[in-house]
């Protein structure tokens, strides 16, 4: 009987030890899990805090422009109206280099000798004021070598001005075909330079679409909004019509149709449904301009040739006919392999169905190797090779469009 009691107590002790071990393991596991949870939570919280701090300078704080003082801390220079009035010669007509729906752009020289482009927003109408706020809020956080840089701003009473870097060679369109005010003296760009510009413009759009959350839709990309510096490096400009996309999957904005004839995507023109693929279509039109040297819409041409996309699209995928669309000024500068590759990219970008168009990241990846093999090796300390088929033009003095 005593032996049975000893055996019973041994079993009880074994069970107790087992329960204690499992309980200890469970508690330890819970502690580890809780510690990991706290670690992850703190890590995420820090990221959110950093993100909030980074973007807080661009948040809208009521209808006033007091937040511009915060934006100034992010590297933008604050100008007085008197300074900019002096820089532009009293906003004289001789210094006007662009006009738009929300104001005019003037050539200016600051006291330190820097050349700038100054956008004077229209004082009449609420829309102009809202446009100013949108541009400042966007541009204070959009920084890329392929986007036009905002140097500073002025906000005094009813005076709202933006100060941009000056682009010595003006808009891309000035170097592709004759335009009013250029007197046909603007130099034509060579093949290598056109492809380089195509890549840089694509990188600008890629940044807006892929590296900003939520993505920014330009909505009015065109050759006149792709500006060239003194070395013919390209930067995308004019975010006056830019819209922040939805943060939902496949984000889009629905709004009244704005844009420029010949560049507007079909689905946007018909429904007002705007997505990043709408920008891709506009980019495709610019790519066609680079290939053909033609304006997007010219009803003075022969029947069937007035609309660039309609005329070029059937030829872009035909190896025998694709050469028919090429700008005569480029003759002898390209290989058929290069033309076919670029034509294929353009054809995908201007597809009528938005879903069939590529992402701008795909466009960039397609152009990078092509441009790389065409560009000569640049020695350290020397500038990149950018060329025109004529001498530099004194008429190319444009900077951002209004």
PLM-predicted stretches and their roles:
Residues 241-243:
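Activation segment
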Residues 313-355:
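C-terminal lobe substrate-recognition/regulatory segment of protein kinase catalytic domains
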Residues 203-216:
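Protein kinase catalytic-loop region centered on the HRD/HxD motif
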Residues 152-153:
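A short, aromatic-enriched beta-strand patch in the conserved N-lobe beta-sheet
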Residues 1-13, 18-27, 45-66, 70-73, ...:
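Intrinsically disordered, low-complexity cytosolic regulatory tails
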Residues 11-138, 142-148, 157-163, 169, ...:
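Membrane-proximal cytoplasmic juxtamembrane segment of single-pass receptors
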Residues 279:
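Conserved catalytic-loop aspartate of Hanks-type protein kinases
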